[in-house]
Amino acid sequence: MKIQGKMFIWLAVFILAMAIIYGVWSKEPAGTTALFLAFGLSIMIGYYLAFTARRVDAGAQDNKEADVADDAGEVGFFSPHSWQPLALGIGGALAFMGVVFGWWLLYFSAPIILIGLWGWVFEYYRGESRTQ
């Protein structure tokens, strides 16, 4: 986290310099305000990361000799035979085609998305009365 905090603080310094240069040269208030707000956001994130890095133990990303696998945690449960992602993919494709070809396609895509989402969330749910 130390490296990420330093990166955001240096990014904030760069954004501040660009905001001052942009504000002086362009005299345009909207872009100058947006750049100063981006500076503030970057400072807040950088300070938070630097402050948190002092409170927690050093992670694998702070060690220059670490491998990627050193920081990898448990990925989670994988459902190899699930059809629900296919339903969500088809529904999402129809929804985005509705943006291109006509909003009427959303009437067909919304039920497919809802069925796919409902099925994926409750795929392994067996009820409250059963014990695992």
Curated annotation (Swiss-Prot):
Family: Belongs to the cytochrome c oxidase bacterial subunit CtaF family.
Coiled coil stretches, renumbered: none
Nucleotide-binding found in the keyword field: no
Pfam families with a match to the protein in the record: Cyt_c_ox_IV (PF12270)
E.C. code: 7.1.1.9
Membrane topology: Multi-pass membrane protein
An individual GO BP term: electron transport chain
Protein's cellular compartments: Cell membrane
GO terms assigned for molecular function: cytochrome-c oxidase activity
Subunit-structure text: Associates with subunits I, II and III to form cytochrome c oxidase.
Record's keyword terms, sorted: Cell membrane, Membrane, Translocase, Transmembrane, Transmembrane helix
Regions crossing the membrane: 5-25, 33-53, 86-106, 107-127
The encoding gene: ctaF
Function: Part of cytochrome c oxidase, its function is unknown.
Record-given protein name: Probable cytochrome c oxidase polypeptide 4
A GO CC annotation given for this chain: plasma membrane
Main location: membrane
Catalysed reactions, semicolon-separated: 4 Fe(II)-[cytochrome c] + O2 + 8 H(+)(in) = 4 Fe(III)-[cytochrome c] + 2 H2O + 4 H(+)(out)
